[in-house]
Amino acid sequence: MEIKDCIESILISEEEIDSITSSLAEKITEDYKNSEKELVLLCVLKGSIVFTSDLMKKISIPLEVETMKVSSYGGSTVSSGVIKIQLDLCRDDLSKVDILIIEDIVDSGNTLAKLTKHLLKKGASSVKTCTLLDKPSRRVVDFVPDYCGKVIPDEFVVGYGLDYDEKFRNLPFIGILKPEVYGKTSAEAN
């Protein structure tokens, strides 16, 4: 089966992603251009790597990039609610930087809420969040990202770094995955 056979529809085109990324980069540049601290983009692996790569190229102020690997899904399509830091930030002194966590999608809000607390506990002077996609209808904690590219409906989406079972990250657009691909019948998906 080819990738195109697994996609129900394209939710966000390559062109729209580019426009969203440019708009977010402009806002971030404007908000941080007068900061006395270095901006650090913290890429949450693996999902946000494509978004982070494109976003950082459009931000027109000096910045650094760090990565963390955090898991809350395991092999499921639904977050377990248990946030596991698999690879922590290697930087020791966080008091001299502005951290902007870059995430591909916010569902429950658990990951970014807990990651923000974790970084503040490690001594970060400022932590903000940026997500390409937001599903506020799935929120289980009180969390609003500081920067949001687009609010989307409660659909299972893949592409542009987002995956199902480690696949589909390579799609240049955001697509809705056919329910039969991830084991749901059409009736269960709705």
Language model features by range: what are they?
Residues 1-190:
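PRPP-associated nucleotide enzymes
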